């Protein structure tokens, strides 16, 4: 056991985690050169296309160190985006140490900090690594100082490497062996295995990634899931070398995968403990704290026949992504669907794309909203995650919106732009610290503004140099109103949105204009209105298509023309009272982009 090292690789987006993992795998001979490819751990098509890591992946490697011993390295490559920070915290729970990878050109960024603090809170040994030293812009000395100054861990000894060219990879491995402690645990105690992650395989059922804390797990053992008390037979188990490789036993301290032919998706929840059926452990291992979704949106299948398939797909996906929340919802405009909770907009996009690709569904998404705390006049407090559920105005005493605490690291030259942006988003500055050329800004900004497009705007206003990390702080009373969109004086529930009163007029007008461009012209006028309660704040009209009824009477008598026009007008009036308007899919997505173009 003393030769096992469990660690995660944490870093900001694009600081080279996945490339470093590639090099480690190559150096330790996990894959032959023929099977090696760039970012070999990002196995999902989506990850390869976007060039980001979404799922944490684990690998077991054998490394023959300079002291002649062979060490077993179990490492987990983690995502860098703030939306997937839950994946990171789960991965860290299975480790004794973490490699903090910092780009020697970019320096410390917000996510570096956030992930590093998560690791320190879990009592992990953090080993700083300066990556990308082959870049012309690299300045390892300055960055090492930055790490000491901002993060507060000793970085003068930090290993310098370049994952792309392979310089210094040996040093990284030696550093891992030297600095990261071996796992603690008793191989003779009753089995305790923590489920770190699980996914659904159509042939094998539920596959779980586990970390053995105490005891030993063998093929053929009878095991029990501690939260449900159900027992299963271990059919297969093994490790990832990135390929799934079968073994007969998982020793104490190891990380590996287990298949027990569990057909039920809720059979082995993430964060649960596995133990032996007969000699079972008494205590459950501390799991993970549940994360609360920050953004809610309705997802509806385009054709209602897909509803069952959609429900199964969500079940299988939520097994793999423990931070996804969903409950059934109906909408008069869109039929049956689900209200889903996500950790952020990127998470929402990814989930929607995975559903459409992996499960072959066509989906419509409604506008994302955050969760609001509403105090009723009778003193009751309700939580509202969709504009349709907002109680009538005369029953509401006050609406409180969620406030996010945003930590940003900004280079000095972009400070002005970033502050302007934060003020525009109704932010309040709470802290500002200078670290050399970087400035650490802390703002309290309403969550609704942060999730919408704050991240994109922050990146574009600072040419990509500013970085952001945010978390929910508290609820705070605000003057929020619900803007309803009416088409031919019928409310379309899927288009409603909750906004701050100051922005309501502008958002309403912009949305109505956008809808006018997207709804196809019909044979009659379509009135599109935005309303707060019964008060109309904006309107625009999609003009009707009309036939030229006067074409056939050349000169002709004016009363004849009047008669024809009058007849057309009556026909249009009748059509308008009977006609209904089809709202195209693009119109629902228009809400997402209101306020983006300016």
Curated annotation (Swiss-Prot):
Binding-site list for GTP: 14-19, 131-134
Membrane topology classification: Peripheral membrane protein
Catalytic activity line of the entry: GTP + H2O = GDP + phosphate + H(+)
Biological process, per Gene Ontology: positive regulation of translation
Subcellular location(s) per record: Cell inner membrane
Domain tr-type G: from-to ranges: 2-184
Protein name, per record: Elongation factor 4
């Amino acid at each position: 056991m003393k030769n096992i090292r469990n660690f995660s690789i944490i870093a900001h987006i694009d600081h080279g985690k996945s490339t470093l993992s590639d090099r480690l795998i190559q150096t330790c001979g996990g894959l032959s050169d023929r099977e090696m490819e760039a970012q070999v751990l990002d196995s999902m098509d989506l990850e390869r296309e976007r060039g980001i890591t979404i799922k944490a992946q684990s690998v077991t490697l054998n490394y023959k160190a300079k002291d002649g011993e062979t060490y077993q390295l179990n490492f987990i490559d983690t995502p860098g985006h703030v939306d997937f920070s839950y994946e990171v915290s789960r991965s860290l729970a299975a480790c004794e140490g973490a490699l903090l990878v910092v780009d020697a050109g970019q320096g410390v960024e917000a996510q570096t900090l956030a992930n590093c603090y998560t690791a320190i809170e879990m009592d992990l040994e953090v080993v700083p690594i300066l990556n990308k030293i082959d870049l012309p812009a690299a300045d390892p000395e300055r960055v090492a100082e930055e790490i000491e100054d901002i993060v507060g861990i000793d970085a003068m000894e930090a290993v310098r490497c370049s994952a792309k060219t392979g310089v210094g990879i040996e040093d990284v491995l030696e550093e891992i062996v030297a600095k990261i402690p071996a796992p603690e645990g008793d191989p003779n105690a009753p089995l305790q295995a923590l489920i770190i992650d699980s996914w659904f395989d159509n042939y094998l059922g539920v596959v779980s990634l586990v970390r053995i804390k105490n005891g030993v797990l063998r093929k053929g053992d009878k095991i029990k899931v501690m939260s449900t008390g159900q027992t299963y037979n271990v059919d297969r188990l093994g490790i990832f070398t990135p390929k799934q490789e079968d073994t007969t036993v998982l020793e104490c301290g190891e990380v590996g995968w287990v298949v027990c032919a569990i057909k039920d998706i809720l059979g082995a929840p993430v964060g649960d403990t596995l133990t032996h059926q007969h000699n079972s452990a008494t205590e459950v291992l501390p799991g993970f704290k549940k994360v609360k979704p920050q953004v809610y949106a309705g997802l509806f299948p385009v054709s209602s026949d897909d509803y069952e398939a959609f429900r199964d797909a969500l079940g299988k996906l939520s097994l793999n992504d423990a931070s996804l929340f969903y409950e059934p919802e109906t909408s008069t405009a869109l039929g049956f669907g689900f209200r889903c909770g996500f950790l952020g907009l990127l998470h929402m996009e990814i989930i929607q794309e995975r559903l459409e690709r992996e499960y072959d569904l066509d989906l419509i998404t409604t506008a994302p909203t955050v969760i609001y705390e509403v105090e009723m006049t009778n003193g009751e407090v309700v939580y509202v995650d969709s504009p349709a559920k907002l109680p009538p105005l005369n029953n509401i005493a006050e609406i409180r919106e969620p406030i996010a605490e945003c930590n940003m690291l900004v280079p000095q030259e972009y400070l002005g732009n970033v502050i302007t942006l934060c003020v525009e988003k109704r932010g309040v500055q709470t802290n500002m610290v200078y670290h050399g050329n970087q400035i650490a800004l802390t703002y309290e900004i309403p969550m609704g503004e942060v999730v919408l497009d704050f991240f994109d705007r922050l990146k574009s206003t600072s040419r990509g140099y500013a970085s952001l990390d945010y978390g929910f702080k508290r609820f705070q009373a605000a003057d929020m109103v619900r803007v309803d969109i009416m088409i031919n004086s019928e409310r379309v529930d899927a288009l409603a949105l909750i906004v701050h009163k100051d922005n309501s007029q502008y958002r309403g007008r912009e949305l109505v204009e956008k809808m006018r461009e997207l709804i196809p012209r019909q044979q009659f006028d379509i009135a599109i209105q935005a309303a707060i309660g019964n008060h109309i704040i904006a309107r625009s009209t999609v003009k009707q298509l009309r036939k030229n009824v006067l074409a056939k009477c050349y000169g002709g008598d004016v009363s004849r023309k009047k008669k024809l026009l009058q007849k057309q007008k009556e026909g249009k009036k009748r059509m308008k009272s009977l006609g209904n308007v089809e709202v195209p899919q693009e119109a629902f997505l228009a809400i997402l982009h209101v306020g983006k173009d300016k």
